[in-house]
């Protein structure tokens, strides 16, 4: 053999050909040779590369409407929604049972890092119950108050919910809010008491809380441990028994509700749809009721929990649909899709998300403007609750004014921009949307409305132009151990809150309801509440409209010039404390100049706070080694006159780093 290898490359090829032929005849490895005359010999060779077309497709016609259940899991933060979803996926065989099954449906990096659910996720589960095969469509929802819009969207595709409550912590503020979301949507509610394996768990106490607050009989509660898998199977049985099947008909024309969507840079928009009527399959031509554009369906399927293509989707089922939508504005959440030339009455959509917090967003480097614009457009498709307006700043350049549902929502959006699109941004101090009622017909004609909304403090109108200012208010719910009630009530009073209700939900826990001005809770209220209650209190709020308020626009001046980026709107009673704090932070952030810098907070022409950045000072007396004192005084006087002149002609340039530092400290306060 070695002589063949040494005779040149062609002899090596001859050897390879001989080995191949010998292997085929079974001379080298007889046990691997195919048996003659068998099916193995006549069968075409298998393809050894992957192909999307060869995916095994599920026949969804096997699941009639009567055997379909659509449900969500709702709960307060960290009460075990995602863990329960993991166990349900394991029980139904959607995923293998391994120790690594943690937050399977939480696919975003930010969700895994923070241990929270941000995006509602769907999974279709196939479950055999009493000899029948059922299709259970599960939607895992977020628990934080900032993402309640995600919850309400998810509930529109469901007929029932699992209301998960921690057996140790009991009912919390977001539990109450989520219950009423499901109750108002007239969904079947199955209470599930989780974490019964904990040492301090008291499921009987929680059962009584559920009975008292929600008026649900205690015997309807299911006690489980999602972590250990204890009694989880009874949850699936209850879903089938207690949640009704969707009222849908395959014979009717197609009506599909788009309740969520994601963007894939290769396949375009992937729309999550709930079919209320009809059937949709690959090749169908569909029309968007919102844009009236026509598309051809490229792929339909279910999430199990990963994408699983199917031949068709039928009425009552929940799945995904890809139809060549390349523009991020084409997939509107709440839109109705129907078959071409078969128009239908559009389904009622969703209330548009109402931004509670606005902040300016600018690229760190203006050369990255177009990349950041593209990233924001794609991310707002996945998160349609973000409102975007173009904005510009003298110091920070071109950017946007973005509206968010809360501070956590803003932080998560910023983190997703960095992680998913590698975009670095500057975020300004968050503000809330105020309103002003204009005083004259001339102004009403100019603005085209009597009541204007102000999302940028720099555009806050002067008092002479308005009859009254309005600020947004929210109805807040606080649930706390009774030992912290006094401290929390004092905190609420300091935030200008008005008490509306107070009730004991059991012997040791109190539920307080307050009407808060939104700007008093938007930055640091939650942190203060947790600090005062040693982490035990929970907080949730809902929009309660607007109320009249004494608001003032506070300008920040550097040597008499207004810095627009630091203009803020505050309540008259808090103007001094807020102004002084901003001046102090700016003093620590600004670099010293050759002249003195006066940092002032002003309400109109009235200065209410001031800090001074001292000038660099040259020692002009260094060359004087004694002599007459008048010589020294003359030099010092000349230096002072020069500094005064320099201050008049010198413009204070605020470095971008100083802006970032001041704005970040203000929002982290």
Curated annotation (Swiss-Prot):
Q: What is its EC number?
A: 3.6.5.-
- Keyword Transit peptide assigned: yes
Q: Name one GO molecular function term.
A: GTPase activity
According to UniProt, the reaction catalysed is: GTP + H2O = GDP + phosphate + H(+)
| Topology versus the membrane | Peripheral membrane protein
Q: Name one Pfam family in it.
A: LepA_C
Binding positions for GTP per the UniProt entry = 75-82, 140-144, 194-197
**Biological-process GO terms, alphabetical:** positive regulation of translation; translation
All copies of domain tr-type G, residue ranges: 66-247
UniProt-annotated location(s): Mitochondrion inner membrane
| GO cellular-component term (any) | mitochondrion
Q: Which UniProt keywords apply?
A: GTP-binding, Hydrolase, Membrane, Mitochondrion, Mitochondrion inner membrane, Nucleotide-binding, Protein biosynthesis, Transit peptide
The UniProt record lists the keyword Coiled coil: no
Where does the source fall among the domains of life?
A: Eukaryota
Under Gene3D superfamilies, the record lists: 3.30.70.240, Elongation factor 4, C-terminal domain, Elongation Factor G (Translational Gtpase), domain 3, P-loop containing nucleotide triphosphate hydrolases, Translation factors
PROSITE patterns, sorted: G_TR_1 (PS00301), G_TR_2 (PS51722)
InterPro entries on file: EF-4 (IPR006297), EFG_III/V (IPR035647), EFG_V-like (IPR000640), EFTu-like_2 (IPR004161), G_TR_CS (IPR031157), LepA_C_sf (IPR038363), LepA_CTD (IPR013842), LepA_IV (IPR035654)
Q: Which HAMAP family match?
A: LepA
User: What job does the chain carry out?
Assistant: Promotes mitochondrial protein synthesis. May act as a fidelity factor of the translation reaction, by catalyzing a one-codon backward translocation of tRNAs on improperly translocated ribosomes. Binds to mitochondrial ribosomes in a GTP-dependent manner.
Please report which protein family the annotation says this sequence is part of.
Belongs to the TRAFAC class translation factor GTPase superfamily. Classic translation factor GTPase family. LepA subfamily.
Q: What is this protein called?
A: Translation factor GUF1, mitochondrial
Q: Which organism is it from?
A: Bos taurus
